[in-house]
Amino acid sequence: MPITNHTSRRNVLRGLGAATALTVAGCTDSTDAGNGANSEESTDTGGDAEITAAWVFNSEVGDLGWSWAHNEGRKTVASEYDWLETRFTEAVAPEESEQVFRQYADSGVDIIFGCTFGYQDPMATVAEEYPDVYFEHNTGYTTLENMGRFMGRIYEARYLAGQAAGLVSETDTLGYVAAFPIPEVVRGINAYTLGAASVNDAVSTKVRWTNTWFDPPSESEAASALLDEDVDVMAQHQDSPAALTEAADAGIWATGYDAPMGEQAGEHYLTSPIWHWEEFYGPTVEAVRDDEWEADAYWKGLESGICSIDDWGPDVSQDVRDEVAATRAEIIEGSLDIWAGTEFEGESDEFLFQEMSSYVESVDGEVPS
């Protein structure tokens, strides 16, 4: 598995070479920014880079999904700071990630971002070996002196999408194609359902699990099974738009995840909970540059801008838009507690983040063990 190590555009123009690569046998790299696997974009436009940051993604960047959203955040901060050099490697399986983290640490980067849950233990192993390198793990629970963790309260955006779903549903039955039965995903299902139930007492959510983050055939199959159960709004927690397009093709409302997916759903698009990871990456690389970085457990929500819902689909009524906008304002100002009235009311952030493992009342069935 290669890690790309792209020099700055300024140095390219000076004729000092386009890129070098640290490689693992059997893999190649590309230095043509934005074109294919392992490509790299450098945005050092003024002087030599003072800070070098590396990102490791579990899937290909592509044009949609989890890794795409993270890479958009990387590109945004790279374009904003002329003192920052960025590198990334995509499509790294968790079992391969330790080697990639170690290669980046050996290459002299200042900070490494690992962007999937399965990287937690491999990153912790490497972080202990390289105390002078900073590490940030996305979605996990572990922190070390030189390893922080970060996530956004995307469940707040899911609550808003769920409220919209409850307002447009005619069968009172929502479908949810879920990834893995971990607290992150369970939180999303619960928040989505609570949002719907806040405007529709009769609503229920049916869930199908794929046990994958990216497997379009499995996602389509799960969505198809839900269509047979009279759902008329579909939600998902995967990188691809497969569940969304299955729903749109069947003529029902659909909500995506991670990235804007209106083009894939057309007139049946409701909205999507989406990420703006630059809201974390920017302050973090600034802290590294200013020698103020500290390992912490970042978990902010709508108020920070790290997450939101996408633009509305073309057929979403103004009444729906207005009601959801009012709810969004209540969440941001702190007057609405999403978990109020549920078994999770009053639970700590630690519990909500690490231990939520059961459904709220309006979700059918039980969370798989």
Q: What name fits each language-model region?
A:
Residues 49, 150, 298-300:
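Generic detection of short hydrophobic beta-strand segments and adjacent strand-loop junctions
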Residues 180, 210-211:
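Subtilisin-like peptidase catalytic core
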Residues 214-215:
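Membrane translocator/pore-forming domains, dominated by Gram-negative outer-membrane beta-barrels
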Residues 1-131, 137-146, 167-173, 187-190, ...:
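Terminal disorder- and signal-encoded targeting elements
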Residues 142-164, 178-181, 266-279:
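Short beta-strand elements at the ligand-binding edges of bilobed clamshell
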Residues 79, 272-276, 292-293, 297-303:
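Functional cleft and adjacent loop/helix regions within the main domain
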Residues 182, 298, 302-312:
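Internal, active-site/partner-interface "lid" segment
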